[in-house]
Amino acid sequence: SAASDVYKRQVVGNCNSQTAPYGVELPQEARCWSDVLKDMDYRTGYIGKWHLDSPYKPYVDTYNNHGKVAWNEWCPPERRHGFEHWIAYGTYDYHLKPMYWNATAPRDSFYYVNQWGPAYEADRAIEYIQAQKESKQPFALVVSMNPPHTGYELVPDRYKALYKDMDVEALCANRPDIPAKGTEMGNYFRNNIRNYYAC
């Protein structure tokens, strides 16, 4: 069945979890749609975030690999499932100064940019698409932007301004899925929703 195939492939959830174990990464031998396209002579590109590999020691020296849990990891080319153009990272939530590995970078050669992650990724995607115009070869591009994600406040002020007057309580009215004001999660929602929308 489809369900047993999912678990055979070790996919145990479709969202991040603080209780998810390492060892559930997408297996290198799993055949993905990107592998199929690459085999059919597509040019393939991936830009953005992808929790593709689990961190391993010595951890990549980024802020989110210090402490109890390491999050960020480089993905070697043979594990990228056919994606040849690569501007990506495992996870990095400083959205106003993100970091990336390009297609040929070794594990210790990531770089930072002084631009909001989604804007940088959109610019790189536009460049990639424009570079394909003269080719008769088909292409596929995935752009996986991190925000909206914690560090909700890490969004350019011009986008925050669009939501500064949003009536948060009106948004919460008649919504049983939003926790009550005064509760931990209710307050978290109310404190972050404007920036979430700004992302």
Model-derived features: positions:
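Short glycine/proline- and charge-enriched loop/turn segments
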Residues: 11-19, 61-68, 103-108, 163
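Aromatic- and acidic-residue-enriched segments that line the glycan-binding/catalytic groove
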Residues: 56-83, 147-172
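A structural signal for well-ordered alpha-helical scaffolds and beta->alpha junctions
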Residues: 30, 79-80, 118, 122, ...
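Active-site-proximal cap/lid insertion segments
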Residues: 1, 91-119, 126-199
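Loop/turn elements at helix/coil->beta-strand transitions in domains of secreted/extracellular proteins
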Residues: 40-45, 81-84, 135-141
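Active-site segment of extracytoplasmic enzymes that catalyze sulfate/phosphate-ester chemistry
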Residues: 1-47, 52-61, 91, 98
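Extracytoplasmic/secreted proteins, especially bacterial periplasmic and envelope-associated proteins
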Residues: 28, 32, 36-39, 120, ...
